[in-house]
Amino acid sequence: MLEKVRFDLPQDEIPTEWYNILPDLPEPLPEPQDPTGKSFEILKQVLPSKVLELEFSKERYIKIPEEVLQRYLQVGRPTPIIRARKLEEYLGGYIKIYMKMESHTYTGSHKINSALAHVYFAKLDNAKFVSTETGAGQWGSAVALASALFNIQAHIFMVRTSYYAKPYRRYLMQMYNAQVHPSPSEFTRYGREVLAKDPNTPGSLGIAISEAVYYALENGGKYVVGSVVNSDILFKTIAGMEAKKQMEMIGEDPDYIIGVVGGGSNYAALAYPFLGEELRKGKVRRKYIASGAIEVPKMTKGVYKYDYPDTAKILPMLKMYTIGSDFIPAPVYAGGLRYHAVAPTLSLLMYKGIVQARDYSQEEAFSWAKLFSQIEGWVPAPETSHALPILKEIVEEAKKSGEKKTVLISFSGHGLLDLANYADVLGFNKE
């Protein structure tokens, strides 16, 4: 008898609302701070007005505009849930593994979920263009496609080390007619200042954010935020809202929800619709575990305090786990994990002990990626691979308890454009 591995939600059952966790948090989220008195004014100028409004909304559910919903369908939503039956067998049969496959979107990752909303709202404001940062290129690719679909120009500031290490993501953005700049770049005043201090800098997401904000501010565009802030997480919860319906359809209730954190939007987008329900009931049964890169240990070695989300310190300060906005991470290939801080809502949940954190080295994560590819056939993005080592911990817990555990994992993107990076670390190029 055939065993089902793919679980699809019909297009006509796609969720029509985003979920906002703010009203369900265990305590109020600390307010942003503006020491200079200028940051809030800058935000009002550079963010789409509706995005800024939704950033502080206390409404639990927000209706998705029909124009955005239609384009969700166009780019591959709803995405399937895949059961990793062969990996379950390899790990001894102690756990059931369900993967929310955000790799199935047209750009190959979860990032398109919020890019469409941000760009749509920028278009409503009659923006001349949109600008944003990108690390590995996943967010940049998503903004490039969203901009093409809404017929508006995109300027993407790509962290310099990834710009050269991941040329195919750059080419994908250019296929969508985006203009892509290595960050720090000669294209902006701030970029030139950074390069003057260190011509060989690998760049950082903090620097790229600063360039994108300055460029929008000085040239009549709108800046679109790729992670961290509440509104971006809100837009991405379409993935978690779908997954909740799918798990109910399958007849499973996850014991663990796991995923990786760059700024936090990927993990939060999957986990929050499940966690919010538990917070409203006053009891959290599931285990929520988020992982990152040990080379950028903001979750495990960071401090929960107010810090700037960007290197130039032009945006309001947010209370979050951080290793410092000036931190320049090692040029690891999981570019999306190289951000210095964690989203304020996720930081609060970590601080309260509701969400646990883990960090893994590039070598360990990539070894798991190779194993996973051999067993299941899917090649995970370098970022996504950092969630896989959590499985060994869950297997040990299942062994001790004597109960089979169900895991839901955010398969946040594929690694088909990152094979050269895998080859470098795993030694494929050695004669």
Swiss-Prot record:
<dbReference type="InterPro" id="IPR023026">
    <property type="entry name" value="Trp_synth_beta/beta-like"/>
</dbReference>
<comment type="function">
    <text>The beta subunit is responsible for the synthesis of L-tryptophan from indole and L-serine.</text>
</comment>
<dbReference type="GO" id="GO:0005737">
    <property type="term" value="C:cytoplasm"/>
</dbReference>
<dbReference type="Pfam" id="PF00291">
    <property type="entry name" value="PALP"/>
</dbReference>
<keyword id="KW-0057">Aromatic amino acid biosynthesis</keyword>
<keyword id="KW-0663">Pyridoxal phosphate</keyword>
<comment type="pathway">
    <text>Amino-acid biosynthesis; L-tryptophan biosynthesis; L-tryptophan from chorismate: step 5/5.</text>
</comment>
<dbReference type="InterPro" id="IPR001926">
    <property type="entry name" value="TrpB-like_PALP"/>
</dbReference>
<dbReference type="GO" id="GO:0052684">
    <property type="term" value="F:L-serine hydro-lyase (adding indole, L-tryptophan-forming) activity"/>
</dbReference>
<keyword id="KW-0028">Amino-acid biosynthesis</keyword>
<dbReference type="InterPro" id="IPR006653">
    <property type="entry name" value="Trp_synth_b_CS"/>
</dbReference>
<dbReference type="GO" id="GO:0030170">
    <property type="term" value="F:pyridoxal phosphate binding"/>
</dbReference>
<dbReference type="InterPro" id="IPR036052">
    <property type="entry name" value="TrpB-like_PALP_sf"/>
</dbReference>
<keyword id="KW-0456">Lyase</keyword>
<protein>
    <recommendedName>
        <fullName>Tryptophan synthase beta chain 2</fullName>
        <ecNumber>4.2.1.20</ecNumber>
    </recommendedName>
</protein>
<dbReference type="GO" id="GO:0004834">
    <property type="term" value="F:tryptophan synthase activity"/>
</dbReference>
<comment type="subunit">
    <text>Tetramer of two alpha and two beta chains.</text>
</comment>
<feature type="modified residue" description="N6-(pyridoxal phosphate)lysine">
    <location>
        <position position="111"/>
    </location>
</feature>
<keyword id="KW-0822">Tryptophan biosynthesis</keyword>
<dbReference type="InterPro" id="IPR006316">
    <property type="entry name" value="Trp_synth_b-like"/>
</dbReference>
<comment type="similarity">
    <text>Belongs to the TrpB family.</text>
</comment>
